[in-house]
Amino acid sequence: MSDSTMDTQLALLVWGIAVCVTLAIVVPRWIGNNSKEPPSLGGSMLSNTYQYMTDMHGFLQRVASAQRSSKIIKFRLGPKKIYMVSGEKNIQAINRPSHSISPDVFFLEVMANVWGASKEEVGKFKQDQSGRSKNPVPGHDVKPGQPRLWHGQHRVYSEYLQRTDHANALSNKYFQLFSERLTKQPLGDWTELRLSHFFESDMAEAALVALMGPRIVELNPGFWPTMWEFARLAPRLMWGLPRWVNPKPWEIRELFHGMCRRYVDAAKREFDWNGPDVDAGWEPHYGSRMARELISWAEKNLSPETTAGMVATFIFGTNANSVPMSTWAMMELIADPELYHAVREECLAASTLDPATGERVFDTQKLLSMPLLQSVYIETLRLHVSINVTREVTQPISLDGHVLTPGSLIQAPSQIGQYSEVWGCDGHPASQFWAGRHLKHDSGRPEFTMAGRTASFFPFGGGPSICPGRVFAKQEILMTVAALVTRFEIELIEWTHPDGSKSDRPAQNDQSYIGAVGIPPDRDMKVRWKRLW
């Protein structure tokens, strides 16, 4: 047995003893039987905690099984009580603004563990109870001279990431950069490539440059391997084993934060805040107006180290969702040539030839409204996004006939998107991709519909903390698919392992990403393609 293995086992043993001692102290305080409390998940506290931290896929399977008899199941993550919630009415309830539950706890955990914010910085956000809206929550005005932190950050996202003109400018910049990469492919010749590798390089870099400019890659050799490793390990910073048991995620965090710090420092040195680019939609130092405004806000309220951590998390959040979702969508289309050509026809119908350049351009709004393309998009997210929407109970609240106690957490796994009772259709199990699942044909032509199931579909979270990048993400994914299916003939050669060796099965969800992010495929697809124009 190696020294490193013995060290790991010893660390796990010490960690287990520490947990048991803690439980011995606090368990007596929990004894008592409240009939209004929801039923408990089976298993011991220690086994549930360990499985939650190391095997989210298996843990959520147990939760799903338990929720067949109760929509709310409780368990303890160490000393913290957590309610796992499903059911349309319950999901709607936790996503409504409420004085009894707060979405802030998840963001504060991200700040502390993924951004690397200090206790003092996290404390300032905790103290700010004024909310995200323009007007402070009644009775929670901040003191004179103190910033409204939640509102300040929310305003940047609302103005520069979600407002139609800024969102369209950002997606158009991305499409320009991505198209430039596609035109470098040989015209009329068949070539081979691995699909996931293409998306993780060409698509990811086009999106990064559109958002953050080119300097972050130029300043940091080895940027992409480090970014993807950070994306893989970031969920473990939130819910995984302690740093002293598993230090690797924190080591990668520090390395990637350092890269982002170089980018932030260089932009601050080189950008002229009194020059003509101060209101530009895009310039090469910061990249997009959104990035410039967000970093400007952060530098007024956070340390340079935490600002870099915020940038790192934003980059991870952007690429670790849109890239695997685009990969999955294209894998499904390529594996089904009839579907591929049907989506192509829709995309061509949403495009025109530019008379000045002869280039094909897309009407973005028309493209986003195409029924089959929308159904493919929703079906992809339904199957391949896995997040646990998290809320903190701040006052006693009744939910589904149960009373949830203050200080506890509520989590709603998006795995409900795969429940047969919600999404299953004859001949089309909820566990399988079906492009027609979100279409109806009442008028004789296909129409997109969610059929009243929106409460069972929340890949971007919900309520006041819903993902601010969802507008850009949808445009980015659909424009990527449209560009590829209209420009290329693509044929499946074989499925491969990530190292390029042949696989005996198609891709499945990589279970190590369950619970916190868009899930990438665990296999790659080797294809041959030919550029048509």
UniProtKB/Swiss-Prot annotation:
The chain crosses the membrane at residues 8-28. Signal peptide: none annotated. One of its GO terms (biological process) is mycotoxin biosynthetic process. Pathway: Secondary metabolite biosynthesis. Induction: Expression is induced in complex medium (Czapek yeast autolysate medium) supporting calbistrin production. Keywords: Glycoprotein, Heme, Iron, Membrane, Metal-binding, Monooxygenase, Oxidoreductase, Transmembrane, Transmembrane helix. Residues 123-148 are annotated as: Disordered. InterPro entries: CYP450_sterol_14alpha_dmase (IPR050529), Cyt_P450 (IPR001128), Cyt_P450_E_grp-I (IPR002401), Cyt_P450_sf (IPR036396). Calbistrin A has been reported to possess a number of interesting bioactivities including antifungal active against Candida albicans and cytotoxic toward both healthy and leukemic human cells. GO terms for cellular component: membrane. Its EC number is 1.-.-.-. SUPFAM superfamilies: Cytochrome P450. Its cofactor is heme. One of its GO terms (molecular function) is heme binding. It is a single-pass membrane protein. Heme binds at C467. It is found in: Membrane. Glycans are attached at N33, N388. Belongs to the cytochrome P450 family. Cytochrome P450 monooxygenase; part of the gene cluster that mediates the biosynthesis of calbistrin A and related compounds. Calbistrin A is a secondary metabolite with an interesting structure that was recently found to have bioactivity against leukemia cells. It consists of two polyketides linked by an ester bond: a bicyclic decalin containing polyketide and a linear 12 carbon dioic acid structure. The polyketide synthase calA is probably responsible for forming the decalin moiety. This is Cytochrome P450 monooxygenase calL. It comes from Penicillium decumbens. The gene is calL.
